[in-house]
Amino acid sequence: MRVTDFSFELPESLIAHYPMPERSSCRLLSLDGPTGALTHGTFTDLLDKLNPGDLLVFNNTRVIPARLFGRKASGGKIEVLVERMLDEKRILAHIRASKAPKPGAELLLGDDESINATMTARHGALFEVEFNDDRSVLDILNSIGHIPLPPYIDRPDEDADRELYQTVYSEKPGAVAAPTAGLHFDEPLLEKLRAKGVEMAFVTLHVGAGTFQPVRVDTIEDHIMHSEYAEVPQDVVDAVLAAKARGNRVIAVGTTSVRSLESAAQAAKNDLIEPFFDDTQIFIYPGFQYKVVDALVTNFHLPESTLIMLVSAFAGYQHTMNAYKAAVEEKYRFFSYGDAMFITYNPQAINERVGE
């Protein structure tokens, strides 16, 4: 399969740079997986699409202010993007500089360069950085860090992004990017879903900066997926198994919830799904056998990205590309702050040939 098979034309004007004034007021394009039929509506229509007893699985990660500016003590400017917090004092990060710092290099971080840190080791493209400060990493990031808006949102971060670029149920700090499908859920909608009898469960996947890395190979099968930490606790496993036993659907809110659930299913030895607390490098593309997820809430993804491949594996390649073509024609808003899709599983997707 070629990466270019997942390309589509997207006018710049359709990339959303700000969210809607109300979280749940965005548009919703529904794609019926088996037939490919499309329905246009608004996000609150989700209430009519879910049945009592269906299970919504959310990702409760919280975005950290992971972008830091500063300079090397020797003079050159640097930009640091935290990939993950290793412990109370150390981070693993991407560093942009005219010349990469060497182990032992002193870094002065923050807009006022008030935080002292040391680059202690290099691991491939990532740098290990230790803060020389009494405060925890999270406290330091909260005081000097910027919200790491995706590269296609072409503006500086604003104070409002600290809340707007978080889901209302975010709980566990650690992500470099928001699980954006969840941004559309506000408290009134969640309350209505609960009142209808829709069940809810929460996984954790700390989205890494790798989510924005382009696929740099021509053939999909050659791509090496970035690694992210995921948690699927026992209560989620119980909720999934109970929903399946009732004949209800498991609906993943966002591709990160999909990747968490399907990672836990892949690693399970005795049951459909078992608890999972580990790094995952799961790469879902056409031909993948879904085991857990029956429906998906997701935003519109970048051309040639691993996420449009994941959706194609779920709904079918042809149905997905047709839906994206319709979304462009109907001027849906794309990417992190954009509109959403509701997709049901296409069991024939696994047999579909792509790019032939």
From Swiss-Prot:
Pathway: tRNA modification; tRNA-queuosine biosynthesis. PANTHER family: S-ADENOSYLMETHIONINE:TRNA RIBOSYLTRANSFERASE-ISOMERASE. InterPro entries: QueA, QueA_dom1, QueA_dom2, QueA_sf. This is S-adenosylmethionine:tRNA ribosyltransferase-isomerase. It comes from Escherichia coli O45:K1 (strain S88 / ExPEC). It catalyses: 7-aminomethyl-7-carbaguanosine(34) in tRNA + S-adenosyl-L-methionine = epoxyqueuosine(34) in tRNA + adenine + L-methionine + 2 H(+). HAMAP family: QueA. The gene is queA. It comes from the Bacteria. One of its GO terms (cellular component) is cytoplasm.
